[in-house]
Amino acid sequence: METAKPRILVVEDEAAIRDGLTDLLVYHGFEVDAVGDGRDGLQKALSGQHDLLLLDVMLPGRDGFAICDEVRKVDRDVAIIMLTAKTSDDDIVNGLALGADDYIAKPFSIAQLVLRVKAVLRRSRALAAAAAQIKLAGDVEIDVQNLSGRRGKESLTFTRREMEILEYLQRNTQRPVSRDELLTRVWGYDRSAEIETRTVDIHVAKLRRKIEVDAKEPRSLITVRGAGYRLLVSA
């Protein structure tokens, strides 16, 4: 039986970039829908028909941040990569805080774009085969498959990227995991690429606010000085 091709939505207002991305992704075996307007992009993004969204930040109608925000209110599973000429810390934090899995700064390497798209989709499949639950200190239980959990009586929800981080740390709970390892194994970045590690720190900070009783004094997702992060699970 032939496996269905992953379906990607490209929302990019510059026609040359949009057409180039479409041709590139089709060449690499993906099905692609492409639009150049933020309002049309939001409508298609909310259809639930795509495995991954490539969103430009600066768009007519609705910008990429707004699309990401609206999608994450109803869909925590679809992968989202932001395409942006904005690379300041505030812009990066904003996109990731709204639930984007990754961001790629323009101008970008074609090879790196394809690698990141494939890595995001590959991790999605790996997550589906992960352990069912993770238990942490503070009466925290995490349901990996449903991207949800609870801390005491409080319900928790996670983005797919957040759960991928937790799942990878849980599989390697006996040791600290470095930022570089997370970027390579979870994000799928090339080891030779110069990557801003603040991406990892932003996601870890978000996770701590969800799973820790006191995010400033973490008991479960701890920092090992000079080595990285470690997840301490409960029996």
Per-range role (PLM):
Residues 111, 175-186:
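Short coil-to-helix segment of the ABC ATPase nucleotide-binding domain corresponding to the Q-loop/switch region
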Residues 1-126:
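N-terminal/domain-start alpha-helical segments
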Residues 72, 121, 170, 190, ...:
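Protein kinase-like catalytic domain
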Residues 127-134, 157, 202-235:
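DNA-binding patch around the recognition helix
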Residues 4-7, 119-176, 180:
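Short, Lys/Arg-enriched segments at the junction into DNA-binding effector domains
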Residues 1-3, 74, 134, 150, ...:
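Short, flexible hinge/linker loops that cap or flank conserved catalytic cores
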Residues 189-198:
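Short, positively charged loop/turn segments that connect secondary-structure elements
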Residues 165-166, 182, 200, 207, ...:
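DNA major-groove recognition helices of helix-turn-helix
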